Structure formats: structure tokens, C-alpha cells
């Protein structure tokens, strides 16, 4: 790192990788002139676990439990992209009911991720109360996840061709009750935070990104939409069944930390709208179709009594990934989560490239913090919303 030659008595400060305000194991080498930030160099890789190489030595079903460790606060999205890639590669159609279930789970996971962004973000700014409030709602989402998937965090719920299990009896009513309750919770957050003068002093005109800069840096998600770019893959790519619901893309034009906060608050409201519509319109029918496809290929294939005993434990069948390549993407809470998949007529992917939104969004941090105050670093870093599990992979 080159230091400016014109300044004297510069101080170099290490923030992290074990720092009380750091969002994971991230290290920042910050060069200071008093309180002013002259330079900032992020050091990554402390949580690198070779996720892409592991994928090349596993079948998709064997790899599914690994992917929930990328963004461990929004695990439904990492599962979704992992099963979407082979589904698109082999043109596997999923039942309508399974698609609706996926949308419900994805939007619940989006709310849970935004909540656990909001709490630490406010704690970074010195407000401890919202940090405790967000866990009140987040635990209710975990209760819904646990009832449907058996796990509160690492769900392992999505499958190629559908989902692992149907929604249990009474789950839909509980989900609707949560939606009604959570809308009141969002109003409470806005009354507590949005017009607070201390909060506004910390976030207004801090970390400004223009629309042109956001596009040139490859930013996505709330980082992009807060700079005036109305780009949401749920509207652009129309994956799953998002085109069957009425909702609006949340965006702001100011491009600062306050705009990114407002976008995420608005997204939680829109997620509730999508969930309510999906729950009310959810059709009947199967929740997966790979078993049906497998039995159609075999002559005189039928279930026997012994197999029925293990119906819940039957894994999805493996299949060869044809020799072709494609890029699949979804709108995760932090931005565009993508997979570049190359098949090689084998059970394992030949190449499995992950495009994590947090890694791309983090690259603009040194530019944002230059000429700012030391205290603004945590404001800007918090507004980016990163999880080091997906940044380092």
C-alpha cells in the first residue's frame, strides 16, 4: 500500500479481523490523518473454504448441505441457485405448488436476512434497542422454517425438481398470522428509526454512490437500487413464479446510506405482499417431480410397502450433467447471486463458479471511505451488508 508523500504523521490502524463491529472476519488496513481516512485496504480470505472446488467433487444433492454455509443468514437463496442451475441445464420443470412454496420460503428468508442486517447496522451507529427488537420477528420466521424444514438455519430444503417436503398442516395459517404481525413491526421500526435526527446525521450523504458508478462497479441488489437503478431480477428474469404476484421494485435515487436503509425497509414490506399472495393462491398437486420422471423411465416400476416406510428419507435421484454450460442468477437479499455451471456428461460439475453479491459489492468500499471520518467506516460498511461466508467462499 503506497502512502501519500505530502502528508506527515500518518497513522495506520488495523480494523479486524476480530473486531467487535466487523461483519465477519474482515480486516481493513486504514491509513488515517487524524480522523480523516486517507486510504483503506480490505484483506479477504479468512473464511475461504474452497466451496467451488468441493462442488466439482460432489453430486448436486451431496453438495446441497455445503451451500447453506455461503450466506448463512439467507440460506434458502443459496439452496435455490444450487438446484436452479441443474434444472435449467437439463430443462427440468417443477410443479406449480413447489414453485409457490419456494417463493414463500425465499421471501421469508429475505426478510430474515434484512432483519439481521438492520440490527447490527443500528448497533454500529450506537442504537442498541433495534438490535434486540429484530430478533423478536426473526425468531418467528425461524419457527416457520423449523415447522416446514426441520431446521432453523441450515435448512437443506430445496431439491432438484421441487422441495424436500410439503408444507405441514396449519403452516399456512401461521404464516398469514406472522405477515399481519410483521407489518406492524415494520411500522414500529420506521417510527423508531427513520426520522430519528441522530440516525439521519450518521447516514445522510454518507457513502454516496451515483447510478453510473453503481453500474460500472457491477453492484447489485439494494446497493444498485438505492442509486436510482430499478433493476430487480425477480422482475427481469421472471424465475420461479414471481410474475404471478403484484409487487413493486423498491428504489431510491439519493445513493447514500440512508437510501440503502430505505430500500431494504421497503423490500421487507414488499416481501410480505408476495408471501400473502402466494399463500392465498397456492395450488394443490405434487411438491416435486424427479421421482415421477425416474419411474416413467423404468418399466413396471411401482412402490412396494417396504419403500413406503422410507418415503421421507428417499434422496433425489442423481443424473448426469450434459456437456454444456450456462449462467443462472437470482435476486438474493444482498444482490445478484449467480452460478456459472459447466457440465461434462458426468455426475459432478466440471466447473462450478459462484458469483457472490457481497464480494462484488465490497470492492467499492475503499473508494467510499476515502476522505470520510473514521467513524463513518462502520456506517458505510454496514450499509453495504456483507457476509464473509459468501465473500470468501
Curated annotation (Swiss-Prot):
Q: Which InterPro entries match?
A: NADH_Q_OxRdtase_suD, NADH_UbQ_OxRdtase_49kDa_CS, NDH1_su_D/H, NiFe-Hase_large
Q: Name one GO molecular function term.
A: NAD binding
- Keyword Plastid in record: yes
Which superkingdom, per the lineage?
Answer: Eukaryota
Q: What is its main location?
A: plastid
Q: What family is this?
A: Belongs to the complex I 49 kDa subunit family.
The protein depicted here goes by the name NAD(P)H-quinone oxidoreductase subunit H, chloroplastic
Amino acid at each position: 500500500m503506497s502512502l501519500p508523500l505530502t502528508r506527515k504523521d500518518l497513522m495506520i490502524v488495523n480494523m479486524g479481523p476480530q473486531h467487535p463491529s466487523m461483519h465477519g472476519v474482515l480486516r481493513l488496513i486504514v491509513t488515517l490523518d487524524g480522523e480523516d481516512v486517507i486510504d483503506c485496504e480490505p484483506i479477504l480470505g479468512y473464511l475461504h473454504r474452497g466451496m467451488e472446488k468441493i462442488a466439482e467433487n460432489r453430486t448436486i444433492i451431496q453438495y446441497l448441505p455445503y451451500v447453506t454455509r455461503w450466506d448463512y443468514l439467507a440460506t434458502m437463496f443459496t439452496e435455490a441457485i444450487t438446484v436452479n442451475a441443474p434444472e435449467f441445464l437439463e430443462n427440468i420443470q417443477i410443479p406449480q405448488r413447489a414453485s409457490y412454496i419456494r417463493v414463500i420460503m425465499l421471501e421469508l428468508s429475505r426478510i430474515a436476512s434484512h432483519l439481521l442486517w438492520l440490527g447490527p447496522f443500528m448497533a454500529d451507529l450506537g442504537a442498541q434497542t433495534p438490535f434486540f427488537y429484530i430478533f423478536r420477528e426473526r425468531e418467528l420466521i425461524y419457527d416457520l422454517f423449523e415447522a416446514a424444514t426441520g431446521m432453523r438455519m441450515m435448512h437443506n430444503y430445496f431439491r432438484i425438481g421441487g422441495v424436500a417436503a410439503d408444507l405441514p398442516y396449519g403452516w399456512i395459517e401461521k404464516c398469514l398470522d406472522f405477515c399481519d404481525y410483521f407489518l406492524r413491526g415494520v411500522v414500529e421500526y420506521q417510527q423508531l428509526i427513520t426520522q430519528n435526527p441522530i440516525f439521519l446525521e450518521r447516514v445522510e450523504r454518507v457513502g454516496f454512490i451515483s447510478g453510473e458508478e453503481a453500474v460500472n462497479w457491477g453492484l447489485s441488489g439494494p446497493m444498485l437500487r438505492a442509486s436510482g437503478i430499478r433493476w430487480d431480477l425477480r422482475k427481469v428474469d421472471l424465475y420461479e413464479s414471481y410474475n404471478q404476484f403484484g409487487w413493486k421494485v423498491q428504489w431510491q435515487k439519493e445513493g447514500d446510506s440512508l437510501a440503502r436503509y430505505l430500500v431494504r425497509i421497503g423490500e421487507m414490506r414488499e416481501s410480505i405482499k408476495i408471501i400473502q399472495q402466494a399463500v392465498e393462491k397456492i395450488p394443490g398437486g405434487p411438491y416435486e417431480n424427479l421421482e415421477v420422471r425416474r419411474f416413467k423411465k423404468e418399466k413396471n416400476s411401482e412402490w412396494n410397502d417396504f419403500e413406503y416406510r422410507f418415503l421421507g428419507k428417499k434422496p433425489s435421484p442423481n443424473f448426469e450433467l450434459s456437456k454444456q454450460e450456462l449462467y443462472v442468477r437470482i435476486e438474493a437479499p444482498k444482490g445478484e447471486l449467480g452460478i456459472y455451471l459447466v457440465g461434462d456428461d458426468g455426475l459432478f460439475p466440471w466447473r462450478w463458479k459462484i458469483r457472490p453479491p457481497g464480494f462484488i459489492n465490497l470492492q467499492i468500499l475503499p473508494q467510499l471511505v476515502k476522505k470520510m471520518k473514521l467513524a463513518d467506516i462502520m456506517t458505510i460498511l454496514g450499509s453495504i451488508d456483507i457476509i464473509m461466508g459468501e465473500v470468501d467462499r
